[in-house]
Amino acid sequence: MRGGTVLLILILLLGVIARSPMTALAAASILALSYLGWGGLLEWIEQNGVDTGLIMLTLAMLAPFATGKVGLREVLLSFASLPGIIAVIGGVLATNLNKRGIDLLSGEPQIIVGMIVGSLLGIVLFGGIPVGPLMAGGLTALILQIYGWLSK
């Protein structure tokens, strides 16, 4: 058994134990594609998966506008409130962290295993919700940068 297969099986098991269906399903899907010999699809997922996932997430965030659950009035009112202004600042900070996460993951893809384990521990110990590796990667990059500053 290849090392990558062993890691995927471990991630699958951790996902099941931690009751994280997204993690378990992702690991099981990649294992299945690998065993079916669908290397081309695996390569496509590796190259385009993050962008495709972000598109799906953005679609989910924009859907309330199309369904009429959120209108222009609500959006404008949110910008006039303290929570709305803080939400804009939070969005700016989050996108910056997410970019750092993508940069870290593309430069050091092996770090994803630690982030997955950390995410699963967050689910089990703190009732967290796994939203993917970007925020975990961004926070990891920020912590590594702070560590770099402090260790000089």
Swiss-Prot record:
Membrane topology: Multi-pass membrane protein
Domain of life: Bacteria
GO CC terms: plasma membrane
Pfam families in UniProt: DUF441
Chief location: membrane
Protein localization: Cell membrane
Keywords recorded for this protein, A-Z: Cell membrane, Membrane, Transmembrane, Transmembrane helix
Transmembrane segments: 6-26, 52-72, 75-95, 111-131, 132-152
The family this protein is said to belong to: Belongs to the UPF0756 family.
Protein name as annotated: UPF0756 membrane protein Helmi_09930
Taxonomic classification: Bacteria, Bacillati, Bacillota, Clostridia, Eubacteriales
